[in-house]
Regions:
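Short hinge/gating elements
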Residues: 69-75, 260-265, 374-377, 434-441
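Catalytic cores of nucleotide-enabled group-transfer and carboxylate-activating enzymes in metabolic
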Residues: 34, 286-287, 334, 362
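Core structural elements
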Residues: 45-59, 110-130, 249-255, 273-275, ...
Length: 554
């Protein structure tokens, strides 16, 4: 059996809970035959795999390195180390280009691109190595026609603008015409870069506000003419220019990609994406290896399936599909009982990593088509009924009744925990008094005080919380503890305001997922002291340090 989850923390918890469950079942089992089976399961626990998909792929590659074409002693490249290696490969490549291939830099300069601007493109290619890069040389486009048409339009449109600024200011179309006219008077539009910069500025959808024109017909005429200019000349010219630049950019970046791959090979390192791609290739191209691992892992369980990307999905189907020689994973039929996945499409938040609801829905469709069963879990064991009622009422109007390619369907929660009499439950709202001019700093201060005061009342026993049987077994009472509270902020820049409100009441707290510690007043004051020590000739920094809380000289 192999059980795969998304994070190392979740994998560690899964291992612990699985072993404890087996031990508890073994201790409580009276049937000799079942007890013997549980004993065997415990003794052979190491034969199961419980971990992340990347560690699972690493284990498969280490077991069949020859067929995979990898160094048997390869090491996994952690994300931080991988980022450092990418930066090293990029810096070394740029240095090599400056010394050995200055004409490549001249090509980039010709299209208005600095080498440093390409690092993000370089990283994107490395992140998706399975995506084929289009690399086709395109001649430099002739921009003379779009330049002439643009100048003609600006000359004509300018004459229809009001002589004075309208009372409510220029509308978006008027402002765009004025900006275009200024640009062509300051810069030489015979320079392709200056012309392209202007075309990019004009690639907008400005609307004319008729009451800001001397004649409403003029507003309509100019708006229609601008749309025609865009559709017939501006957009095609920009498209041709981008196609021309694309080949130059790709040609500039691919050698750096090769340099990075060589550095990895020299060190026998595989990053997370390599582990996935190498494993998918190993299983796709080797039916015998596929058969071997299918015998080894007869049952595959996958948690957090909504976080699975196309390559990971491919691996799952290769490991469970009956057709050993079929290379298209979509044509594979998982063996009955071999694949079990759990996922919540409403938690699909990794689209930037190609793990989105499209993959989830496609796998769901394929499994149903191949005879699999889809079970919807609606029972909520964590929340009390007051929370469930509120959630159902809010999200019924947010999610569609039927799932589509963009969004999961609404599924009402069936909460089983009852609200306890005398205990606080449900969703409440803090109401703030009206703040003059809606000054955000004052609103944040008041909100922080409200929340900290509410927490302090709970710690003092002014209200009680519902507890689960497990919480009571661990010694928790109805009286709230500091760990019962979580403050979620939309913006982290106000985090220090909330921490100060908690500190004022001696309420312990922990910051997660933010930079509040480095942005705190204490850290800013420490930085001022260090800056004064570093630059002792700067009187401004010295004064800032002396006025900090460490010296307190006003």
């Amino acid at each position: 059996m192999a059980a795969i989850t998304f994070t190392r923390k979740a994998a560690a918890e899964l291992k612990e809970r699985f072993q404890l469950s087996l031990e508890e079942a073994f201790a409580n089992e009276a049937d000799p035959l079942k007890k013997e089976r549980l004993d065997q399961a415990l003794s052979k626990l190491e034969r199961c795999f419980l971990g992340t998909v990347h560690s699972f792929c690493a284990a498969l590659l280490r077991e069949r390195p020859v067929e995979a074409g990898v160094d048997p002693s390869f090491e996994e490249l952690e994300e931080l180390d991988d980022a450092l290696l990418r930066k090293r490969a990029w810096d070394e490549y740029l240095l090599w280009v400056q010394v050995n291939k200055p004409e490549a830099l001249a090509e980039l300069e010709k299209i208005g691109c600095e080498p440093a601007d390409l690092f993000t493109f370089f990283e994107t290619i490395l992140t998706y190595p399975d995506v084929e890069i289009v690399r086709e040389a395109v001649p430099e486009p002739d921009l003379s026609q779009v330049k002439d048409e643009l100048i003609h339009f600006l000359d004509w449109a300018k004459t229809l603008l009001p002589a004075q600024v309208p009372p409510k200011g220029w509308d978006a179309l008027q402002e765009l015409i004025r900006k275009g006219d200024r640009h062509r008077r300051v810069f030489d539009l015979n320079d392709p870069l200056q012309l392209i910069r202007l075309l990019n500025e004009l690639d907008r959808k400005p609307k004319a506000v008729k009451n800001r024109w001397d004649d409403k017909d003029n507003a309509e005429s100019v708006e229609a003419a601008f749309e025609d200019l865009k559709d017939r000349f501006l957009i095609p010219a920009l498209q041709q220019w981008r196609e021309y630049c694309h080949y130059i950019l790709v040609s500039s970046v691919l050698p750096a990609v090769e340099s990075y791959q060589n550095l990895k090979a020299e060190k026998s390192k595989l990053n997370f994406q390599d582990l996935l791609l190498q494993t998918a290739s190993l299983l796709k191209e080797n039916p015998e290896v596929r058969r071997y691992f299918q015998k080894r892992f007869t049952h595959l369980l996958v948690d957090e399936f909504q976080d699975t990307d196309p390559v990971q999905t491919e691996i799952l189907f290769y490991l469970t599909g009956e057709e050993l020689t079929e290379k298209d994973w979509r044509q594979l039929t998982p063996k009955p009982g071999s694949l079990f996945v759990v996922g919540d499409p409403k938690q699909s938040i990794y689209r930037f990593r190609r793990a989105d609801i499209d993959i989830y829905n496609e796998v769901k469709r394929l499994l149903k088509q191949k005879g699999g069963r889809v079970l919807t879990l609606t029972t909520n064991f964590r929340s009390v009924k007051a929370v469930g009622r509120w959630i159902n009422g809010v999200f019924k109007g947010v999610f569609p009744e039927e799932a589509d390619q963009y969004q999961a369907a609404f599924a009402p929660l069936d909460t089983v925990r009852d609200d306890e009499t005398g205990c606080l439950s449900g969703v409440r709202r803090f109401t703030l008094p009206k703040v003059k001019r809606h000054k955000i700093s004052e609103i944040v201060e008041m909100n922080a005080e409200q929340i900290a005061c509410f927490i302090q009342k709970g710690l003092n026993g002014c209200y009680k919380l519902c507890r689960t049987p497990e919480e009571r077994q661990h010694g928790l009472t109805d009286i709230p503890q500091p760990g019962d509270f979580m403050i979620l902020l939309r913006y982290k820049d106000s985090m220090d305001v909330y921490t100060r409100a908690l500190e004022k009441r001696n309420i312990p707290y922990q910051i997660a997922g933010g930079s509040g510690f480095t942005e705190s007043q204490e850290m800013r004051d420490i930085l001022k002291v260090f800056q004064a020590v570093l630059d002792q000739e700067d009187p401004v920094r010295l004064l800032a340090a002396l006025r900090s809380q460490f010296f307190g000289i006003s």
